[in-house]
């Protein structure tokens, strides 16, 4: 952050606006919301980014736990050998997909919406494959590819979020966007996947003939599972990782909704983007 501050000069306010755009002071929240209500592209994009964040935060919160349960590795091994390459791939993919969408936008303005929409859709089969294969290497490859293709929405959310409103509303538009995305994504993504996993665990235990109050997930933890009877240990072996696996697959599948919202944004951009309608 310090290097950026010292080496990158902030462009003048309105530098990227179309010629002739009048500079005005920032507006209050109410006026900003009124302008945003006339921009369907903003709300479709916000819905898509929110779903993507919801799924992403949920998956990332439980990814290491899943790898430990499903493949028998340690948390440290999951972090170093799986999560680090996935994070690197995601960082490169964020830049690559953002750059691609920006380049295509010059001739095809809809690209800023359909590139991330396609990316989110493409990530689904790779995530499902990664969460269902028994091969750790193949799981890692699936996660790496999924991480690479899905993050185009990050560039899109800021480009569209600022591009559909007048200069004086941009900061407020991004504030509204991030409030919704972070509230639902951070707040409910991990909670949702944990709750779904618990439901699958309880149902799995009952299906194997064990009362719900007789066996909890915590009792299946490797550090204490030896205290259980052989029968309960067997039940743990059946449902401990499978319940989380099912939850991860469901969460990954929800990226389809995020993809759909970005594709719905696409036809609105010609009308809603300010640089396409400078008047």
Named regions from a protein language model:
Residues 34-97, 127, 131, 142, ...:
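Extracytoplasmic gate region of multi-pass secondary transporters
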Residues 98-102, 187-239:
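Transmembrane alpha-helix termini and helix-breaking/packing motifs in multi-pass membrane transporters
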Residues 75-79, 167-177:
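Loop-to-transmembrane helix entry/capping segments in MFS-fold secondary transporters
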Residues 41-46, 116, 139, 248:
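Hydrophobic alpha-helix/TM-entry signal in multi-pass membrane transporters
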Residues 6-31, 272-279:
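Flexible cytoplasmic inter-helical loops of multi-pass small-molecule transporters
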Residues 2-7, 124-133, 246-279:
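Multi-pass alpha-helical transporter architecture, strongest
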Residues 105-107, 161-170:
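Paired intracellular helix-loop junctions of major facilitator superfamily
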Residues 102-119:
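Cytoplasmic membrane-interface "Motif A"-like loop-to-helix N-cap segments
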């Amino acid at each position: 952050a310090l290097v950026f501050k010292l080496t990158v000069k902030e462009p003048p306010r309105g530098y990227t606006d179309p010629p002739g755009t009048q500079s005005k002071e920032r507006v209050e929240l109410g006026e900003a919301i009124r302008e945003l209500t006339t921009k369907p592209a903003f709300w479709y994009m916000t819905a898509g980014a929110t779903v993507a964040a919801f799924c992403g935060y949920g998956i990332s919160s439980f990814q290491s736990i899943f790898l430990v349960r499903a493949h028998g590795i340690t948390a440290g091994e999951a972090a170093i050998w799986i999560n680090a390459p996935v994070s690197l791939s995601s960082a490169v993919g964020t830049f690559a997909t953002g750059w691609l969408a920006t380049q295509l936008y010059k001739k095809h303005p809809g690209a800023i919406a359909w590139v991330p929409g396609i990316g989110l859709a493409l990530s689904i089969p790779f995530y499902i494959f990664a969460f269902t294969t028994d091969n750790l290497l193949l799981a890692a490859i699936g996660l790496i590819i999924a991480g690479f293709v899905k993050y185009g929405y990050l560039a899109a959310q800021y480009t569209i979020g600022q591009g559909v409103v007048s200069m004086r509303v941009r900061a407020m538009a991004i504030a509204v966007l991030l409030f919704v995305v972070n509230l639902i994504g951070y707040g409910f993504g991990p909670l949702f996947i944990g709750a779904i996993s618990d439901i699958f665990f309880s149902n799995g235990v009952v299906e194997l003939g064990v009362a719900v109050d007789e066996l909890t997930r915590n009792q299946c933890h490797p550090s204490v599972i030896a205290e259980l009877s052989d029968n309960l240990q067997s039940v743990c072996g059946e449902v401990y990782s499978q319940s989380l696996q099912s939850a991860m697959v469901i969460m990954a599948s929800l990226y389809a909704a995020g993809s759909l919202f970005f594709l719905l944004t696409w036809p609105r951009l010609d009308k809603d983007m300010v640089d396409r309608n400078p008047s």
